[in-house]
Amino acid sequence: MSTDRGRINPRRRGFLTGLGAAGAAGAMLAGFGIEPALAQAIAAAGRSGKKLKAAYSNAGLQATWCAQGKQAAEYWGKLFNVSVTWFDGELSAPKQRSAIDDMASQKWDFAAIQAFGEGTLTQPVQKMINAGIPVIDMDTLIAPLDKIDVHTFIAPDNIFMGAAVTEALVNAIGGEGNIIMTQGALGHSGAQGRAKGFFSVVKNYPKIKVLDTSPADWDVAKTARLWEDLLTRFPKIDAAYFHNDDMA
């Protein structure tokens, strides 16, 4: 693995540490309806004295969650004195790879990336790491953490989420019936975790029948086409688990 992380400018390292702490606190407080003035006070603790340039990318702005992530990054960027440039993944591994190749050809104080698929961005991300640019891996693995030396990896517990949602669905239908799981992108480590959580629960219910587990790649149009077919093929569907809100 690269050891370039040790070359990070001390001022930038301190900012990234503050960003993680203040950003996590701010996101949590925002969830409780905290006023913007308080968010600004929180951000002031980690604000950079020097204007920083950051590159961001997520799977695709067509997804509501990703669009909200962009809005959040730009909002906190203003508070932390960071200029945010966005590289849209467009819910396409090849298109995101092209965007990240472009990102890697430029200089940044740091980059934050949510990959559409694991292993699709390794080369350009490694190029940035080798150039001394700290890369924050968000939500899904860019590559296994023993294969690429990202600055940090931030993700929810997708297995737990998948299991919790599935348990609620199974309880709602009385522990028996027909269920469908519509997955996100199969190469997305978050989707993989949600599927693991799903199967860890349904295996305990012998009267549950899984009718279909096709992916729809987080895409609303693909989901609609898939479900037009599913509703024709299966006259009795008791529950459905979708890997994100938009598909549901």
Give names to the regions the model predicted.
Residues 38-54, 78, 174-176:
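Immediate post-signal peptide segment of exported/extracytoplasmic ligand-binding proteins
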Residues 79-89, 204-216, 220:
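Short beta-strand elements in bilobed, periplasmic/extracellular small-molecule ligand-binding domains
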Residues 1-11, 21-38:
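N-terminal secretory signal peptides
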